[in-house]
Amino acid sequence: MLRVIIGEIPPLSTPQAVARWLSPALRAQQPSGKRQASWLAGRVMLAWAVGTRGLPPLETDPHGKPFLPHRPELAFNLSHSDGVVALTLSDAGAVGCDIERIRPRRSWPSLARAIFSEEEQAMLSALPEEARLPAFWQCWTRREALLKQRGAAVWELLQAPAILTPPEGVFLSDCRVEDLQIAVCACVPCKDIGKRLESLTLASL
């Protein structure tokens, strides 16, 4: 089983959704400030995906990756960007996901030169100018998904291998939905994730 779910953060972080899906103990752990809404929305989405109202606090394994204490056989990963949240859930080993809203970023050419492999940089350079920014986000999300599946830190983007061809033993897939770029990395084949996408709305809760 491999599920990929996306949703808007505001409706998934309402007081009603939070009270229904998150336990008091988990709600007590919520951060304050600008991270709060995305934190709540991600956990509401996770609770809905596993069918657990009153989701208990998550625990962490020896490598620092969170897991569900009542469903330890399920691996999951959350990502958020500019008002949207994504969840990948699997019962077949570790997963990683990344979602980014395709948007201008003044420093993206220098980031690509610093982080991407020569192969990736050559691919970007060969594209028409208008296609380079979306391709940058495609490479970026694939790298993030790979590193998150491995449990690596974001700074290790600099050390990740080229991701045009995934490393042996893992599978990478990505898709674009309107202005969103989504990538998933899993231990099992995950091609055509665009066809797997589920959308979680307030009405579904």
Spans of features found by a protein language model:
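Core catalytic alpha/beta fold that binds nucleotide/phospho-ligands
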Residues: M1-L205
